Amino acid sequence: MAEPRQEFDTMEDQAGDYTMLQDQEGDMDHGLKESPPQPPADDGSEEPGSETSDAKSTPTAEDVTAPLVEERAPDKQATAQSHTEIPEGTTAEEAGIGDTPNMEDQAAGHVTQEPQKVEIFSQSLLVEPGRREGQAPDSGISDWTHQQVPSMSGAPLPPQGLREATHQPLGTRPEDVERSHPASELLWQESPQKEAWGKDRLGSEEEVDEDITMDESSQESPPSQASLAPGTATPQARSVSASGVSGETTSIPGFPAEGSIPLPADFFSKVSAETQASPPEGPGTGPSEEGHEAAPEFTFHVEIKASAPKEQDLEGATVVGAPAEEQKARGPSVGKGTKEASLLEPTDKQPAAGLPGRPVSRVPQLKARVAGVSKDRTGNDEKKAKTSTPSCAKTPSNRPCLSPTRPTPGSSDPLIKPSSPAVCPEPATSPKYVSSVTPRNGSPGTKQMKLKGADGKTGAKIATPRGAATPGQKGTSNATRIPAKTTPSPKTPPGSGEPPKSGERSGYSSPGSPGTPGSRSRTPSLPTPPTREPKKVAVVRTPPKSPSASKSRLQTAPVPMPDLKNVRSKIGSTENLKHQPGGGKVQIINKKLDLSNVQSKCGSKDNIKHVPGGGSVHIVYKPVDLSKVTSKCGSLGNIHHKPGGGQVEVKSEKLDFKDRVQSKIGSLDNITHVPGGGNKKIETHKLTFRENAKAKTDHGAEIVYKSPVVSGDTSPRHLSNVSSTGSIDMVDSPQLATLADEVSASLAKQGL
């Protein structure tokens, strides 16, 4: 039996690949209209619909999804399974050969691989719960799983009316219901084909165990999906859960356990209808929200507490909203407890089916599974409590231990009380569960450690004297009310106290059991489980605190708005501002300035008239008459300037300097200058100064000049009569007269 479990672990690694492929399978629900046509198979037949064309592109686990989508059409199922093309280099697991047996394999009885296929796709449905809403790929896979799970177990589906009753109240949208009906019709067509094969499977315990796993995996999807997307719970989960209501203890869909009381068909509809109305009444919403926050406490089963709030809301609504249904729920639970006592030893694997045989990484899947396990545990503990604890045994079978003496968290908390309607004081709840798990030693040791560790922790919370709550409920309530106690108290005692007492059922009836009383009681003043009245008082006090405290926090009185009418601004300029909130009337008065009476400061602009309204601008230009203006310079007096561009007449007169000007130098007297460029006439006169000149000083020298012939060409003779000063004594030398004449003549020739 260990081999199929190990194969589940290996196959779950492939289930992770489905998450990667969901984005690529967006058109799966629409028949893959955009995908290329399917190439014909070897025998020449072409697959109708070519639904696996996307899967052919890659040899990854996407090939596994190809047969899954094809099974959605019953008439195309045989051809789709027989003619699926497998790329080269693809393993059997990837191609889906080992996971999806065709009709021949099913007829031959190859059943060992079928549970693997169911678990894989139940996981693939739950891998990404956040993507449930409105996505075609998930709905397609969910339809396939909807076909496979009930048909493999060989159980006929409930009638269509019952399925609709279970589908509709859970908030299913109309399109989801329409999508689920074709799948349900396909199930009715497939179930006869596989009925003989399903009956063969009932022979072995291993197959029963695998059916348990399938049923719980199908049951786990509604809480996990409803908690994240309440409107899109898969039709598979709903139909299976509806059919497996009576057979909840054995977890075999369609085969109710012996002695179990089947619930009416409209039970889930009433429960779901009350679920939507009742959770806001009590503190159920608080634990449900904080249940997710408290999840990290359990490193092994993180999802245990995450899924519990959904069941809390579902069953809590049953007790608070409808007392009549509470009686119904308690009645079947008593039957389940008695039935479970008989089935507990024969089927050792049965409680283990609720255990996480698969990797803990599948978070949403374990949510509902552990929630389902909590139901089994409550039934088991009820039976055990009846045998061990006298207080439970005394209570009537119809209302086992929910007498007013044990309201505990349930009395004040509508979520916790209904979660286990048949729960006794349950000191032995978790040990009972662990003991039922221990026979399944075939599973790896790590799984058993996980069971003891995680279930010890959760069970520690369940098995408190107030243990009327499922592990998720207890965990959430502990997390909300005494967050400090949740981690330290349950972890240490369960490890020490519970495992040795797992086999001893009577040991937990003792009031002084170390594991349960001190560590699990919320108030330290209640050490022993038998003392239920004090616990009742303490529990009644404590639970309302968190809702009241949260309400006091949430419902703080709003601060009144300050009166801004009496506030005056510190800036004086804003006092005259009036603001009308409704949008006041803004009047902008445009007054035109009359500038007709304004006189400009500049006198020259007096005649400029400006009309503000854009009138005609008249600029009067008066030309300046310069005819009367006389220039300061007399020579410009005859210049006439006309401002309009008149004629400029410049008269130039020649000046005669001879008449007015006398030259200081006598030689220039006869020079006449004509302004226009006249003739220059230079007259040279002989100088006769020698004749009149006398030397001022007589130096006694004689200048002898003898010139028998007076000629201008002769060289100057020796001047004997010239004094040292240069003056010539004309008296002493009679010859100077002639000398002077010669010098003057020579100078005249030279142009002097």
Curated annotation (Swiss-Prot):
Q: Where in the cell is it found?
A: Cytoplasm, Cytosol; Cell membrane; Cytoplasm, Cytoskeleton; Cell projection, Axon
The entry's comment on post-translational modification says: Polyubiquitinated. Requires functional TRAF6 and may provoke SQSTM1-dependent degradation by the proteasome.
What GO biological process terms does the UniProt entry carry, in alphabetical order?
A: adult walking behavior; amyloid fibril formation; axo-dendritic transport; axon extension; axonogenesis; DNA damage response; female pregnancy; intracellular distribution of mitochondria
Give the Pfam families listed for this entry. Answer: Tubulin-binding (PF00418)
Name positions with the PTM N6-methyllysine.
K570
* Topology within the bilayer: Peripheral membrane protein
The UniProt keywords, alphabetically, are: Acetylation, Cell membrane, Cell projection, Cytoplasm, Cytoskeleton, Disulfide bond, Isopeptide bond, Membrane, Methylation, Microtubule, Phosphoprotein, Repeat, Secreted, Ubl conjugation
Q: Where is the composition biased (Polar residues)?
A: 50-60, 142-151, 233-252, 387-400, 432-446
Q: Which residues are recorded as modified (Phosphoserine)?
A: 35, 50, 191, 204, 489, 496, 502, 506, 509-510, 513, 525, 546, 548, 573, 596, 600, 604, 616, 635, 663, 667, 707, 711, 715, 720, 727, 733
Extent of Basic and acidic residues compositional bias: 173-182, 192-204, 289-313, 374-385
Question: Which parts of the sequence are annotated with region: Disordered?
Answer: 1-567
Which GO terms label this protein's molecular function in UniProt?
apolipoprotein binding; DNA binding; enzyme binding; heat shock protein binding; Hsp90 protein binding; identical protein binding; lipoprotein particle binding; microtubule binding
- Phosphothreonine occurs at T58, T60, T100, T464, T480, T486, T487, T492, T516, T523, T528, T542, T714, T738
Q: Which InterPro entries match?
A: MAP2/MAP4/Tau, MAP_tubulin-bd_rpt, Tau
Where N6-acetyllysine occurs, residue numbers?
Answer: K474, K536, K570, K592, K601, K609, K622, K628, K632, K642, K654, K658, K680, K696
Question: Which residues are reported to carry the modification Omega-N-methylarginine?
Answer: R466, R660
Sites where Phosphotyrosine occurs are at Y18, Y508, Y705
Covalent S-S links between cysteines: C602-C633
Give tissue specificity per the record: Expressed in neurons. The larger forms (isoform tau-A and isoform tau-B) are preferentially expressed in the peripheral nervous system while the other are expressed in the central nervous system. Low amounts of the larger forms are also found in limited areas of the CNS.
What the entry says about domains is:
The tau/MAP repeat binds to tubulin. Type I isoforms contain 3 repeats while type II isoforms contain 4 repeats.
Q: How does it assemble?
A: Interacts with MARK1, MARK2, MARK3 and MARK4. Interacts with SQSTM1 when polyubiquitinated. Interacts with PSMC2 through SQSTM1. Interacts with FKBP4. Binds to CSNK1D. Interacts with SGK1. Interacts with EPM2A; the interaction dephosphorylates MAPT at Ser-388. Interacts with PIN1. Interacts with LRRK2. Interacts with LRP1, leading to endocytosis; this interaction is reduced in the presence of LRPAP1/RAP.
What PANTHER family does the entry give? MICROTUBULE-ASSOCIATED PROTEIN (PTHR11501), MICROTUBULE-ASSOCIATED PROTEIN TAU (PTHR11501:SF14)
Name by which UniProt lists this protein: Microtubule-associated protein tau
Q: Which organism is it from?
A: Rattus norvegicus (Rat)
